Design a protein with these regions (language model features):
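Charged, gly/pro-rich active-site loop segments
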Residues: 78-148
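Short acidic (Asp/Glu) patches
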Residues: 49-52, 62-69, 115-121
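Short beta-strand segments
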Residues: 18-50, 66-67
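Short secondary-structure boundary/capping segments
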Residues: 12, 37, 56, 72, ...
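Short, structured patches in soluble enzyme cores that scaffold and shape functional sites
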Residues: 27, 70, 137-140
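Extreme N-terminal tail/first-helix region
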Residues: 1-17
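Helix-adjacent hinge/juxtasegments
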Residues: 54-61, 65-83, 87
Length: 148
């Protein structure tokens, strides 16, 4: 069993090909790691969210960590960790473009006929919740793998 490093091409491929990653954020003594749907364009990671702990923490401390992996079995996996800055996207046209790209990327993998909202989420009470679109501007990334 030996842990090895992914090269730059392998890191880029894993980031581009996965659908779900995990964001790690920290503020006010709280560390929070949560899975998110995302797209990666070679420079930035783009995500969407409703208001909540993750957004609150990232607004207070924009330094975040992002992790994505592909696990085939216990000794056959690869993982990338990226560090970067949370930036909220506020321009309506850019928000719409990013949301459309997220929908185009995720919809082929959704089993039922539901369509993700384009301007907001609907909560359990049926109220519309503001949709927050953001990016992580990557400053550093590393990758590891194990294959037996």
């Amino acid at each position: 069993m030996m842990l090895r490093e992914l090269n730059d091409t392998q890191i880029e491929d894993l980031l581009k090909n996965q659908l779900i990653g995990r964001i790690g954020c920290h503020s006010d003594g709280i560390t929070y790691v949560v899975p998110v749907n995302y797209i990666y364009d070679g420079l930035n990671i783009y995500c969407h969210s409703g208001k909540g702990m993750k957004i609150n923490l990232m607004r207070k401390n924009p330094e975040v960590c992002f992790e994505v992996d592909e696990i085939k079995e216990i000794t056959n996996w690869q993982s990338v960790i990226a560090w970067g800055q949370f930036e909220e996207i506020t321009a309506i046209d850019e928000k719409q473009q990013v949301m459309q790209k997220l929908i185009n990327r995720i919809m082929p993998h959704i089993v039922d006929d539901s369509v993700p909202p384009s301007h907001g989420f609907v909560d359990e009470e049926g109220d519309t919740v503001e949709l927050i679109i953001y990016k992580i501007v990557i400053t550093r990334k590393t990758g590891r793998f194990e294959k037996r």
